[in-house]
Structures are given as C-alpha cells and as structure tokens.
C-alpha cells in the first residue's frame, strides 16, 4: 500500500504519467520524417534560417514523388509478371512517364538498362506491301556482267 501512495505522490509531483510523444510527421499526416528533413535543411546550410513549414512541405513533396514512382514501377513489374520491383521497373516507369522523365532526365539508374526503341525505318515492311511490290516489279534489278579487266 505504501508503494501505491509513493506512485501517486510522484505522479502529482512530476505532472502525471508521461504522455506519448506526437511527432511532427504524425501531426502533418505524413510517413516521411519531418524532423529529420528539418535537421538536414539546417545542417546543410542552404539558408541562414529555416521556417517551421519548410520541412513539412518538403517531406510532403518527397512522399508524393516516392508514391508516384513506386505506383508506376509496381505497374511495370505487374506488366512483366513479377512481384518484386527491380531497378529495371523503376527505369521503365520513369522514362515512360512524360513528367517524371523530364524531371529525372539527367539521372542514370544503375542496372536499369535502356528503353526498347527500334527506328521505324529499320522495321520490315508489311506483308501486304511486299506482295504488291513483288507482283509489279522484280525485287532487285538484274545484274549486268562485268567486262574482264585489262591486264
């Protein structure tokens, strides 16, 4: 009984039981760490002073971009019948999206490969066009015999 009284006295003395801390990320409804981004902004010396809303805004923008890229990469993985996102899927997602492609145009993704592209001039003609041309004219002109070289 004396132990419970001591706890009550201690609770009154120090302001009650400690409340669970609420982070800035939780207050903003974000997954990205607002406090850490704020610390990086201050430590990086991008400006003399950093406003209280700047890290929240930057965290929200980064979270949105990450969600957008991951959604498109997940779709690319699904199109390739894979369950794991690999750098190739990230590259396909970014390069096939016009806005993300422009934003990340100078970025090289390791193990991403290249976008498949064949110049239309190099593609074979359609079968219908071949049949029409074959009936109208020979495929190649007849070769003429060369005159023998003089020694």
Swiss-Prot record:
The record's Gene Ontology biological-process terms are: heterochromatin formation
| Family, similarity comment | Belongs to the histone H2A family.
User: Keywords for this entry?
Assistant: Acetylation, Chromosome, DNA-binding, Nucleosome core, Nucleus, Phosphoprotein
Pfam families for the chain: Histone (PF00125), Histone_H2A_C (PF16211)
**What PANTHER family does the annotation carry?**
HISTONE H2A (PTHR23430)
Cellular component GO terms held in the UniProt record: nucleosome; nucleus
Q: What is this protein called?
A: Histone H2A.2.1
Indicate which residues form the motif SPKK motif 1. 140-143
